[in-house]
Amino acid sequence: MKLQIKSLYLLCFATGAMLLSSCEDFLDRQEDEKLTFEKIWESRNTTKQYWLNAMSFLPNYNGGFIGDNEPYLGASDECTITYDRGYRSMNFGSWNASNVPYYKMDKYYKGIRECNIFMQNVYKCSDPLATQEQLDEWYWQARFARAYYYFSMMCDYGPIFLIGDELLDFAASTEELYRPRNTWDECVNYVVGELTACAESNAVPVQKGLSTSKYGLATKGTCYAVISRLKLYSARDLFNGNALYRTVKNPVTDKFPELSGVNIFPQTYDANKWLEAAKAAKVLLDDTDYQLYRAGNGDPYEDYYGITHVNWNSELIWTDRYNNRFSWGVNTVPTGLPGTAYGGVGPTQQQVDAYAMNNGRYPITGYEASGDPIVDNASGYSKEEELQKSEWEYPAKGWSNYKNYNITAPNMYKDREPRFYITVFFGGNYWLHGDAKTMISFAKGGNGNKSHDYPKSGYLCNRFYDHTLNSGNGQWGNLTFPVFRLGE
């Protein structure tokens, strides 16, 4: 789990650097007192500060506004975001090589360089206060971070170039820095190999019995979770014999003959990659450190909501910090509520259609060429009555103290599975905030449809808001954002 340790990375290193590089006039230092590169490794404190700096390039999934740092929601088929951010240019195809939104390749290679420097020097630390156990821990956490930086780039750019232990000189010219990309399979094998080494190291902890002071470190489960996701990505059609990528090759170069002119994507489909992905996932399914979250009262709605509501619960493998819930809450709370509310992040209609009925059958099985949904009549969903309103009891009433929770809403939202009601908020329903509830309308002129902050699809995301608190009074609660969880 990755808690507030990452939020301390820059703070600790910046504070230490500030103390170590304070004005000479103020400290009246002698020339030989200046911190040199060699002196960093003489002190436990400065060695740790360098470690924190190397770790500070980890992605920030639970900070800033939704869509500010990552494109994965706004540019997806499952989510729609109102605000004008980089994902919009991706959705409209208006970006190009000169204007790449969310460009982070230089950031991650700088992070890789810092990890390499740290790993090559950490064992030079001569401070008796630095134990072998601490040095081992820092080394392997940095090695995990280096692998994760590669993984993050692969998520964004596909195949990238592997540099191993090389220290790139970012002051060099573009020509000197040029490296051809390794193939996709080479990248996968390298990252999987690095993460496997981390998972097998005695210095990388297991989750069970982990002290709270260690929350934030990558565990063995974290390593296997990244491996599982990467192998899943590698098995899917996008990276497994995709015809669109068969002509993508490295430029011909004499400087790197082994990669000159080679195809960087797999040329043929390999069904065995699905077996490898399944095996990687089973490692975590067999790990008794993690269990699917259960509220303990038999309520499936609370079981599902608790995954993102109960901090540090048993289903979470790795999280992004224990942080204030404001960012996720304020972007998903309807503008019809008092206090700060932006209400612009929600699921698309296709995502809403993907949820099953409470009998387990899926109502929408596909779409006609015209875009009209294909309905499974045996599911109980009626296309003729989907927009008709009727009064029915809202199933996820466990969030509230109200014994009777009846709403008048379209039948298309009636009798759906628990995950639907925990995730999807639709107009004509009450938004619960503490002991209060507010009826929300997304219709034109409604309290949830302002001129600029409103859900374009007519839906908001329900589950990342703490419905037990009243955001109108500035109460947002805290969140351990699930980067990897057992349920996936």
Regions found by a protein language model. Give the residues of each.
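Conserved, well-structured interaction surfaces
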Residues: S43-G64, Y83-G158, E175-K220, E391-Y394, ...
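Bacterial Sec-dependent N-terminal signal peptides
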Residues: M1-D32
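Membrane-proximal, proline-rich intrinsically disordered regions
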Residues: C23-P71, V252-T253, K397, M412-K414
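Short coil/turn linking the two alpha-helices of tandem helical-hairpin repeats
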Residues: M154-C155, F161, L230-N242
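Short coil/turn connectors between adjacent alpha-helices in alpha-solenoid helical repeat scaffolds
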Residues: Y103-Y108, R179-E186, R236-A243, I264-N272
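Elongated scaffold/linker segments in the mid-to-C-terminal portions of large proteins
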Residues: M55, N62, G86-S89, G93-Y103, ...
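TPR/Sel1-like alpha-solenoid repeat signature
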Residues: Y224-L230
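Short, surface-exposed recognition loops and adjoining beta-strand edges that mediate ligand/DNA contacts
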Residues: F65-T82, I163-E166, A203-T222, L238-G346
